[in-house]
Amino acid sequence: MDLVFVTNNDLKFKACQKILDVNLEQVKLPLVEIQGEPREIAILKAKDAFKKVNKPLIINDSSFCIPSLNNFPGPYTSYVEKTLGSNLLKLMEGNKNRDCYYLDILVYIDAYSLKVIETKTYGTLSLTEASGDYYPLDKIFIKDGDNKPICYNQGNMYENNGYVELNNYLKKRKVSRGIVFFADKVLLLYRKRLENNKYLEYYAIPGGGIEKDETKEEACLRELFEETSIKTNIITYLESEEYDTGICYYYLVNYISGDIKLGGEELEKNNPDNYYEVRLVPVSELDNIYIYGKGSEIIKEVYRKYKA
């Protein structure tokens, strides 16, 4: 996977590059600067970056927070670092509570989804400023467990668990599913399987895994044809859903041709203990059945918006 990290901080890029199992490219460009809450600021920066780069990317927006100063500078960290810098120590003169932390908000964005990961790195403010050509705040922040400012620990000063969480997110199985309406009915895959001596019954929106070098749209149409034997085309992308083991992308699709019948691997492995059946289910009956994931909620919302 190719991924862009929009950052002017070379050390942040190197720290991220060591953790992510992707082809990571650094891009330096100015981003929109607004006042607001840290999370809101980070999301708007990511959206601004995506408009300019138009590739899957991440940004990492950091806020330096001092609880005894009401979490100042917080969202004004960049401005304070440029103007006040390590002179921030003067504001702490006589203050016995020198606790502080970095709030890192990592945002991943692509054409289909947006993922926000927040992490905090706790520490204390040093009594004196470290020497050397470093970022001003890095010369006065001592991470918990260390005895000197993080500027002296260049190897891992910008590493945080957010990159690990992002790496796990990017590795999740990607799935595309297509919602097809026939008048007031929706096409679903009925499942009945034996598990721990009990039969589990549920429905799923037709779809499956995205193969290598296949787009999400191509996977949606291919899976629909393999599972239900019908040809369709994409009307619009709807939304994504993240769960423990994967990420699902939902599309509204239009029926073109073909007789509805079970096909593909589902037909080959169909048996009484692992049963598949393609069904047209009235939208009015969705509350009476269980559809895997957010299926029922998404179908009803789409039906109200596009079909009702």
Indicate residue ranges for each PLM-predicted region.
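Short, charged/polar surface micro-motifs in flexible loops or helix N-caps
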Residues: T83-L84, I109-L114, Y122-T124, F181-V186, ...
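Unchanged
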Residues: G132, I210-N233, E241-Y292
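Conserved Nudix-box catalytic region and its N-terminal flanking loop in Nudix hydrolases
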Residues: K185-E226
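Short, well-ordered beta-strand micro-motif
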Residues: V107-Y108, I142, V180, L252-N254, ...
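Conserved N-terminal beta-strand and adjoining loop/helix that marks the start
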Residues: K171-L188
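A short coil-to-beta-strand element that immediately follows conserved catalytic motifs
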Residues: P56-I59, K231-E239
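Nudix hydrolase/Nudix homology domain
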Residues: E159, V164-L170, L200, K261-A308
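Anionic-ligand binding patches
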Residues: L3-V4, L11-R173
